[in-house]
From Swiss-Prot:
Entry similarity comment: Belongs to the NadD family.
Entry keyword Transferase: yes
Pfam families assigned: CTP_transf_like (PF01467)
Role summary: Catalyzes the reversible adenylation of nicotinate mononucleotide (NaMN) to nicotinic acid adenine dinucleotide (NaAD).
Broad class of enzyme this protein falls into: transferase
Entries under PANTHER family matching the protein: NICOTINATE-NUCLEOTIDE ADENYLYLTRANSFERASE-RELATED, PHOSPHOPANTETHEINE ADENYLYLTRANSFERASE
Catalytic activity field: nicotinate beta-D-ribonucleotide + ATP + H(+) = deamido-NAD(+) + diphosphate
EC number, UniProt record: 2.7.7.18
Keyword terms: ATP-binding, NAD, Nucleotide-binding, Nucleotidyltransferase, Pyridine nucleotide biosynthesis, Transferase
GO terms for biological process, alphabetical: NAD biosynthetic process
Organism: Salinispora tropica (strain ATCC BAA-916 / DSM 44818 / JCM 13857 / NBRC 105044 / CNB-440)
Top-level taxon: Bacteria
Record-given protein name: Probable nicotinate-nucleotide adenylyltransferase
Length: 188
């Protein structure tokens, strides 16, 4: 599951769990982006903080793992590089699924080396409350959409809540709330 995870929240975790169940996945590898190319003009927390929050959030689920593959690579993070690296680690016999939000999937036609990406993995777009995928040009054999239980939580809202000293409890895992406070993330 790729994402910025700035911060990771319960919506991400529920989505990963639902997709793992529906597709019979042995494990879900969370891959926090290093330098997200789509967010070059937006402030993003340090990769190490986002990685550690993801480790904290996923620690209690034995099916969840976290990879440093993107944050250890220099330069902008492209999904194709992530998939190539995961293929090298997992081997050719393992079927890869790339889980992302449907809003990110809507922009997939602009992604780097898209044809190769479709050869390397099956893409799963997780629908969020109120979101409708408007692009009908996605190949049905390599892209699936999955509706998950409605959880109107976003990382953007979580950051805004912290910046205005609003409670974050129960939107993100407890350990992530504590990590954000300790590192003083998202405070202006």
């Amino acid at each position: 599951m790729g994402g910025t995870f700035d911060p990771i929240h319960h919506g991400h975790l529920v989505a990963a769990s639902e997709v793992a169940d529906r597709f019979g996945l042995d494990e879900v590898i969370f891959v926090p982006t290093g330098q997200p190319w789509q967010k070059a003009d937006e402030p993003v927390s340090p990769a190490e903080d986002r990685y550690l929050m993801t480790v904290i959030a996923t620690a209690s689920n034995p099916r969840f793992q976290v990879s440093r593959v993107d944050i250890d690579r220099s330069g902008p993070t492209y999904t194709i590089d992530t998939l190539r690296d995961l293929r090298a680690v997992c081997g050719a016999k393992v079927q890869l699924f790339f889980i992302t939000g449907a809003d990110a999937l809507e922009k997939i036609l602009s992604w780097k080396d898209l044809d190769e990406a479709f050869e390397l993995a099956h893409f799963i777009g997780v629908t969020r409350p109120g979101f409708r995928l408007s692009d009908a040009h996605l190949p049905a054999d390599t892209v699936s959409l999955v509706q998950v239980p409605a959880m109107a939580i976003s990382s953007t809202d979580c950051r805004a809540r912290v910046s205005r000293s609003a409670p974050l409890w129960y939107l993100v895992p407890d350990g992530v709330v504590q990590y954000i406070a300790k590192r003083r993330l998202y405070q202006q």
